[in-house]
């Protein structure tokens, strides 16, 4: 009862409506194999929802019969009878094209599914018949809706507000696909929270008293069903303007392996069991060509793997595997480890990536905490101990429920119905994003050529939420710029293939020339593009505007004119609306960062050649206040400086 009392003490319920129908909030931890749901309602702080079988987690599976949808264990039962209509592990397909390596791997592992191209969105569809298809987003929406029904039954009231966990390595397309699925289910998404951040938040909430001004560095190693992610988190108290001294967690480093997880071990063992059955020659047929039998073997492989984590050997057995033929074979832990030797060799890579990205050494890490079901495999722990060099690995959090509990704490903090003690979260964007554009320059021989420019918008591991502004100083006519992912050289070749296109969107600005013609008597201060990366890690282009100022001899009231540009940015990335505004009691504003300057033009090189001139320019700029936020709206002070020196 102690943890419950602790949480009850932390939650101060306020602003409760007299009608409690819509007060409760929920979280959904979307795993590849399991879904965990948690709720907060008046009198019930941070509780895991029990499903209809009174279990604390539900298989992430859905079966579609003619007039019925089956979820969880019922769906898994249908997988043996009719695998073509039972869908699992489809989160790997979110936001991906048919030629993506992960989609191709999915087809190879689960040949019972017929995947086709969505001609409208160029993503993936499950084709059940000539007239019936489902997108992964639609299937995920059904799972989310079912999760909502479990939460409502448990809470005994309607639930709409939700925080959903996503893998930290999800890119913009994958995050928007999850958001679209939530919209299809009718849920109001308060935030998409990275699952590693949710785990870190849950850990910090229950150890609030242990956090002080001295930084504590904790490494979380999470090996789940489909992937592995290693996160370095720094905990310490900081002083805030609004609420005094509060605890904060900051994501310092992240390393991951998209395809290293428990499912890969299951698939190896499944294929080994299929080989053993064929060698017994009890049937003339190849069991690998029978999808129902292969689903039975996959289920048995998962069971045997779990038992071998605590035993040296075990008997795999299935009644009526194929053609009423029973299967029985002994499997040893050594055999399993030999089958997966190359997988275990990959255990250390996420740790090394996390340390490198955080620019830290293992000696600076105070403890290593295990998260995720696959970390229970003894060989995984053995390899992990070698790479971290610690005497032991900590297992002091609930590996299954930590993400769901951290996410529901965040949901309560963002809800207007509850007031919680602040816990500041400084998340980090794993992938850098940059703006690219071309402009015409004059060469020494007076000929003209196009010069390609790059401007870093968000660097790797840049904290968010955060706003930034880029100013284009030398355009006087319509132009376009591209928003792309930045330098991803730290990813391997296979990861880059999975990542897909590096282009997020191309923005075409219309009306620039017309604005300049109408205000030829005004001084141009450039064209400003305002970007926002919100609490969900989603990037949006808020607006683009041309900024003009009157000359000194004109009337003071005409001191500044902002001209909005008609352009194609009303929905920058498409496929889903932006996340609704949330309270700022758990996230904190991000301070400005320096950015890499663009390559100077010939004229600028000449201007900066004389040190005295350079110093004078610096002083002039200081007097003029040429920052990214030098405009009428004082409320944009948090926006970053990002002005290309064209």
UniProtKB/Swiss-Prot annotation:
Single GO MF annotation: ATP-dependent protein folding chaperone
Pfam families reported for this sequence: HSP70
GO terms for cellular component: endoplasmic reticulum chaperone complex; endoplasmic reticulum lumen
Gene3D superfamilies, A to Z: 3.30.30.30, 3.30.420.40, Actin, Chain A, domain 4 (3.90.640.10), Substrate Binding Domain Of DNAk, Chain A, domain 1 (2.60.34.10)
Compartments, record wording: Endoplasmic reticulum lumen
Source domain of life: Eukaryota
Compositionally biased intervals (Basic and acidic residues): 611-646
Annotated segments matching region Disordered: 572-646
InterPro entries xrefs: ATPase_NBD, Heat_shock_70_CS, HSP70_peptide-bd_sf, Hsp_70_fam
CDD domains given in the database record: ASKHA_NBD_HSP70_HYOU1
One BP annotation, GO: negative regulation of hypoxia-induced intrinsic apoptotic signaling pathway
Signal sequence range: 1-22
Keywords, comma-separated and alphabetical: ATP-binding, Chaperone, Endoplasmic reticulum, Nucleotide-binding, Signal
Biased composition (Acidic residues): 590-610
Family in the record: Belongs to the heat shock protein 70 family.
Job of this protein: Has a pivotal role in cytoprotective cellular mechanisms triggered by oxygen deprivation. May play a role as a molecular chaperone and participate in protein folding.
Protein name in the entry: Hypoxia up-regulated protein 1
């Amino acid at each position: 009862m102690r943890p419950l009392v602790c949480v009850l003490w932390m939650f101060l319920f306020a602003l409760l409506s007299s009608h409690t129908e819509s007060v409760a909030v929920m979280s959904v931890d979307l795993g590849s194999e399991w879904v965990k749901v948690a709720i907060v309602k008046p009198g019930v702080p941070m509780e895991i929802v029990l499903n209809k079988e009174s279990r604390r987690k539900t298989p992430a599976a859905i079966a579609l019969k003619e007039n019925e949808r089956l979820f969880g264990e019922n769906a898994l039962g249908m997988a043996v009878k009719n695998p073509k209509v039972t869908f699992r592990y489809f989160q790997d397909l979110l936001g991906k094209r048919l030629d993506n390596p992960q989609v191709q791997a999915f087809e190879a592992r689960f040949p019972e599914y017929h995947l086709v191209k969505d001609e409208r969105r160029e993503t993936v569809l499950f084709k059940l018949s000539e007239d019936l298809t489902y997108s992964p987003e639609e299937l995920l929406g059904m799972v989310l809706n079912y999760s909502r029904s479990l939460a409502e039954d448990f809470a005994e009231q309607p639930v709409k507000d939700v925080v959903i966990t996503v893998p930290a390595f999800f890119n913009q397309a994958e995050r928007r696909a999850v958001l679209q699925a939530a919209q299809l289910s009718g849920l109001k998404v308060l935030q998409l929270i990275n699952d590693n951040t949710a785990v870190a938040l849950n850990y910090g909430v229950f150890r609030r008293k242990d956090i002080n001004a001295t930084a504590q560095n904790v490494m979380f190693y999470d090996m789940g069903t489909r992937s592995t992610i290693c996160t370095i988190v720094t905990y310490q108290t900081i002083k805030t303007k609004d609420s005094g001294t509060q605890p904060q967690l900051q994501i310092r480093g992240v390393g991951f392996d998209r395809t290293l997880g428990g499912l890969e071990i299951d698939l190896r063992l499944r294929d080994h069991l299929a080989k053993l059955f064929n060698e017994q020659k009890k049937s003339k047929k190849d069991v690998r060509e029978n999808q129902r039998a292969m689903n039975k073997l996959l289920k048995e492989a998962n069971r045997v793997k779990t038992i071998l984590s605590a035993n040296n050997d075990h008997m795999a057995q299935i009644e009526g595997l194929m053609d009423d033929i029973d299967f029985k074979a002994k499997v040893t832990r050594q055999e399993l480890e030999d089958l997966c030797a190359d997988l275990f060799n990959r255990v250390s890579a996420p740790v090394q990536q996390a340390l490198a990205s955080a620019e830290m050494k293992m000696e600076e890490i105070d403890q290593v905490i295990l998260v995720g079901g696959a970390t229970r495999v003894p060989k995984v722990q053995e390899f992990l101990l070698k790479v971290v060099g610690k005497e032991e690995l900590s297992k002091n959090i609930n590996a299954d429920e930590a993400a769901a509990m951290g996410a529901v704490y965040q949901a309560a903090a963002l809800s207007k119905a509850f007031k919680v003690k602040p816990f500041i979260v400084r998340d980090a964007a794993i992938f850098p994003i940059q703006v690219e554009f071309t402009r015409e320059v004059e060469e020494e021989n007076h000929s003209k050529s196009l010069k390609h420019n790059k401007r870093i918008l968000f660097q790797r591991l840049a904290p968010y939420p955060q706003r930034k502004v880029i100013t284009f100083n030398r355009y006087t006519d319509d132009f376009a710029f591209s928003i792309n992912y930045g330098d991803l050289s730290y990813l391997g070749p296979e990861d880059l293939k999975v990542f897909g296109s590096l282009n997020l969107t191309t923005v075409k600005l219309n009306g620039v020339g017309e604005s300049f013609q109408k205000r030829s008597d005004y001084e141009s201060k450039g064209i400003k593009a305002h970007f926002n990366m919100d609490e969900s890690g989603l990037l949006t282009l808020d607006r683009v505007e041309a900024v003009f100022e009157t000359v000194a001899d004109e009337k003071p009231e005409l001191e500044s004119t902002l001209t909005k540009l008609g352009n194609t940015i009303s929905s920058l990335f498409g496929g889903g609306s932006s996340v609704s505004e949330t309270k700022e009691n758990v996230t904190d504003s991000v301070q400005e960062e320096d950015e890499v300057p663009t390559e100077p033009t010939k004229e600028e090189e000449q201007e900066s050649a004389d040190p005295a001139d350079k110093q004078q320019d610096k002083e002039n700029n200081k007097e003029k206040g040429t920052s990214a936020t030098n405009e009428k709206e004082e409320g944009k002070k948090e926006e970053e400086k990002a002005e290309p020196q064209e």
